[in-house]
Amino acid sequence: MLTIYNTLSKTKEVFKPLDGNKVRMYVCGMTVYDYCHLGHGRSMVAFDLVTRWLRKSGYELTYVRNITDIDDKIINRANENGETFDALTARMIDAMHEDERRLNILPPDQEPRATDHIAGMHAMIQTLIDKGYAYAPGNGDVYYRVGKFVGYGKLSRKRIEDLRIGARIEVDEAKQDPLDFVLWKGVKPGEPSWESPWGPGRPGWHIECSVMSTCCLGESFDIHGGGSDLEFPHHENEIAQSEAATGKQYANAWMHCGMIRINGEKMSKSLNNFFTIRDVLEKYHPEVVRYLLVASHYRSAINYSEDSLRDAKGALERFYHALRGLPRVAAKGGEAFVERFSVAMNDDFGTPEACAVLFDLVREINRLRDSDVEAAAGLAGRLRELGDVLGVLQLEADDFLRAGAEGKVDAAEVEGLIQARLKARADKNWAESDRIRDQLTAMGVVLEDSKGTTTWRLAD
């Protein structure tokens, strides 16, 4: 029985889809003005994990993740680059998809782009105006009337009165209330724009997600996800817009993943500790980065550091060493491990406990590998099967363990030295065997002897 922590209720709840076995999930995607940073990677991996487990559990999932392809940041960056906004976004979308592919992230079922849904935004804005939840002051903008929506603050637990007292909001004479937010922005010189009933302009950020989610999934759906930094004001505003327009509950459950911290500090460009996914993948194997992002609980903050990446690499090496040398066969046995893994994942996608189960499974594989190869191979298949839920352990063991060797050592030379060492050992020429081992160690190669065979990997 799956339970999910619902940010709306602030409790774990038994997950019950609105429509039988069908699950509809919407996740706020990228604003594509730059390369994806590590925080984007965290969200991508977190909801990829949710996707994999829901499908593994037998649910019929429709996963929608949007692309924000018109925004102040996009316009500013395109102007800086001297290119059109759509040329910039096309490049960044291609780069985002490449980052996802390298991190083994399954593509969403639908990936709507804001600029393809302008007509739907016009329709929802007009509905809000007709119901008294929005107003057009005549300057080309349209604003949402926050004070009219009775449930405002129910997601973030913020009170309108407190927001008014504590907010340092830029004064806008066109607003009836400082808390009102923009639904449609009147055109400005040099900016892209679309025709609308209120004059040319472009949509506000919040209305984009309300329209794309309900267009793809209906007026009410099961799960809405995103980073914890989006809880307020973005997701709060989505609820206000959508529920005022439809009169129905917007999303049944809200899921928010934690942030990335760099050596214990918030990641930011001002602190000079800002990393794109591409930056990190230049130094570390993609599976190491993915394991770092998936091994912590999705609601927890992740501390990104050289130590945490070394720990992730070490964990994967333990897994792949257990798989190494065993025939690749279908999963067999280990039902108790499967049950424990399922219990962990059904408890709000508890990956730390799930990973602990994998380590226990590795110990059992290593215990059996010399005495019962068939049983060990069946459990190795089980390890790969469970690892696939986390999006890891699908490579050939040698390919992972030797990753990074290209350009650092000559694999053919290493293999030749290993064969020479095996001959020296067979001839009981221990001095020559030790000399070759020392030579390989100096090359950064670690040897592992087992039953007359020797395998190798690069040292950390």
From Swiss-Prot:
<dbReference type="InterPro" id="IPR009080">
    <property type="entry name" value="tRNAsynth_Ia_anticodon-bd"/>
</dbReference>
<keyword id="KW-0479">Metal-binding</keyword>
<protein>
    <recommendedName>
        <fullName>Cysteine--tRNA ligase</fullName>
        <ecNumber>6.1.1.16</ecNumber>
    </recommendedName>
</protein>
<dbReference type="Pfam" id="PF23493">
    <property type="entry name" value="CysS_C"/>
</dbReference>
<feature type="short sequence motif" description="'KMSKS' region">
    <location>
        <begin position="266"/>
        <end position="270"/>
    </location>
</feature>
<feature type="binding site">
    <location>
        <position position="209"/>
    </location>
    <ligand>
        <name>Zn(2+)</name>
    </ligand>
</feature>
<dbReference type="Pfam" id="PF09190">
    <property type="entry name" value="DALR_2"/>
</dbReference>
<dbReference type="GO" id="GO:0005524">
    <property type="term" value="F:ATP binding"/>
</dbReference>
<dbReference type="InterPro" id="IPR032678">
    <property type="entry name" value="tRNA-synt_1_cat_dom"/>
</dbReference>
<keyword id="KW-0862">Zinc</keyword>
<feature type="binding site">
    <location>
        <position position="234"/>
    </location>
    <ligand>
        <name>Zn(2+)</name>
    </ligand>
</feature>
<feature type="binding site">
    <location>
        <position position="238"/>
    </location>
    <ligand>
        <name>Zn(2+)</name>
    </ligand>
</feature>
<keyword id="KW-0963">Cytoplasm</keyword>
<dbReference type="Pfam" id="PF01406">
    <property type="entry name" value="tRNA-synt_1e"/>
</dbReference>
<keyword id="KW-0030">Aminoacyl-tRNA synthetase</keyword>
<dbReference type="GO" id="GO:0004817">
    <property type="term" value="F:cysteine-tRNA ligase activity"/>
</dbReference>
<dbReference type="InterPro" id="IPR015273">
    <property type="entry name" value="Cys-tRNA-synt_Ia_DALR"/>
</dbReference>
<keyword id="KW-0547">Nucleotide-binding</keyword>
<feature type="short sequence motif" description="'HIGH' region">
    <location>
        <begin position="30"/>
        <end position="40"/>
    </location>
</feature>
<dbReference type="GO" id="GO:0005829">
    <property type="term" value="C:cytosol"/>
</dbReference>
<dbReference type="GO" id="GO:0008270">
    <property type="term" value="F:zinc ion binding"/>
</dbReference>
<dbReference type="InterPro" id="IPR014729">
    <property type="entry name" value="Rossmann-like_a/b/a_fold"/>
</dbReference>
<dbReference type="InterPro" id="IPR024909">
    <property type="entry name" value="Cys-tRNA/MSH_ligase"/>
</dbReference>
<keyword id="KW-0067">ATP-binding</keyword>
<feature type="binding site">
    <location>
        <position position="28"/>
    </location>
    <ligand>
        <name>Zn(2+)</name>
    </ligand>
</feature>
<keyword id="KW-0436">Ligase</keyword>
<feature type="binding site">
    <location>
        <position position="269"/>
    </location>
    <ligand>
        <name>ATP</name>
    </ligand>
</feature>
<dbReference type="GO" id="GO:0006423">
    <property type="term" value="P:cysteinyl-tRNA aminoacylation"/>
</dbReference>
<dbReference type="InterPro" id="IPR015803">
    <property type="entry name" value="Cys-tRNA-ligase"/>
</dbReference>
<comment type="similarity">
    <text>Belongs to the class-I aminoacyl-tRNA synthetase family.</text>
</comment>
<dbReference type="InterPro" id="IPR056411">
    <property type="entry name" value="CysS_C"/>
</dbReference>
<comment type="subunit">
    <text>Monomer.</text>
</comment>
<keyword id="KW-0648">Protein biosynthesis</keyword>
